[in-house]
Amino acid sequence: MGLSDGEWQLVLNAWGKVETDVAGHGQEVLIRLFTGHPETLEKFDKFKHLKTEAEMKASEDLKKHGNTVLTALGGILKKKGHHEAEVKHLAESHANKHKIPVKYLEFISDAIIHVLHDKHPSDFGADAQAAMSKALELFRNEMAAQYKVLGFHG
């Protein structure tokens, strides 16, 4: 289920918009994740106390973590499918330390698509959305495969 060169170009063009403000985009993605799926907040001891969207927007720690998440994802996307080492490392930490279920990766993928569309509607049309969805699905499938190797059934 690889992406074509054209699809990767759409993904990287969209990601270029993210890179104009990685922390801001990351914060919005996490806010959308936590407000849309409050159960995900339970995996983050550092953020459990944030109960409202206003509290989340005011949290510098949430913004920093959003930057970390999207910086890691951007590094993976830029590898255009050749990211085995990065995914293996990420899967190990997310399975063994953080215990993040694959379902939560689906939730954050949806949040990424929505934030990109909300912030950049003219640059993130149907073709770009489809390509990004495909790239994120590829990433999730590889994370799930690594989880299986690690014996994590999240």
From Swiss-Prot:
Modified residues (Phosphoserine): S4
Annotated catalysed reactions: Fe(III)-heme b-[protein] + nitric oxide + H2O = Fe(II)-heme b-[protein] + nitrite + 2 H(+); H2O2 + AH2 = A + 2 H2O
GO biological process, one term: removal of superoxide radicals
Keywords: Cytoplasm, Heme, Iron, Metal-binding, Muscle protein, Oxidoreductase, Oxygen transport, Phosphoprotein, Transport
Subunit and partners: Monomeric.
Function: Monomeric heme protein which primary function is to store oxygen and facilitate its diffusion within muscle tissues. Reversibly binds oxygen through a pentacoordinated heme iron and enables its timely and efficient release as needed during periods of heightened demand. Depending on the oxidative conditions of tissues and cells, and in addition to its ability to bind oxygen, it also has a nitrite reductase activity whereby it regulates the production of bioactive nitric oxide.
Subcellular location: Cytoplasm, Sarcoplasm
Gene name as annotated: MB
Name of the protein: Myoglobin
Binding residue positions for O2: H65
Matches recorded under InterPro entries: Globin, Globin-like_sf, Myoglobin
Transmembrane region(s): none
Biological source species: Bubalus bubalis (Domestic water buffalo)
Primary localization: cytoplasm
